[in-house]
Amino acid sequence: MAYDIFSQTDDKAYVVDIFTEPIEFNVPAYQRGYRWGKEEVNKLLADLDEVIISDKEYCLNPISLSPPNGVGRIDVIDGQQRLTTLYILYDYLNVINIRAKIYYEARNSSVDIKSILTNIKNGAIGNNVDEYFFNETYKAIEEYFKVPSQKNNEFKNYLKNNKLHYLVYKVDKNDVHGVFIRMNKEKIPLTDAEKVKSLFVSYDEDKKMILN
């Protein structure tokens, strides 16, 4: 039976289960691009470091997802920064076989993050802002684990043993833009250009028009 991220007990979806399944995520074009850097990455790693000592389950910030109509990609309405960072972390540590894919609608929607990470490892970094921050995150993780230690092994074992989980909020397609705006009120303010972009993309999706 195929894994269904929306039908898990208590709305809990474990990160290992998510990443080892052939799930395709889509980050809609109306969202801000990936913007985490060294500071945010190190904060997440430090938080994980603390919980690893206790060896208890750790609940990440909730992730809001909108299921496709039929077969298709799952839209990430809120939580893409952390989801992307965890993907890069698991990819770097290579502790599981990652089958999930994340696509970014504002970029080339046929290229997923795994392909971008392969380019980064080969020193082929694109000249767009998102890839700059993907690379910054990769470097921060690389620096964090550069010295082999017992702690690093404990970190890898914890991630592999499926103790990280999300609370999944399911968002109806008709409520997507309202939910996105409400959830981002308390976060980093969008620039005027990003607000205009969000409005235009919302109109495009609602009216099925293509913007030049």
Language-model features: where?
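Covalent nucleotidyltransferase
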Residues: M1-N212
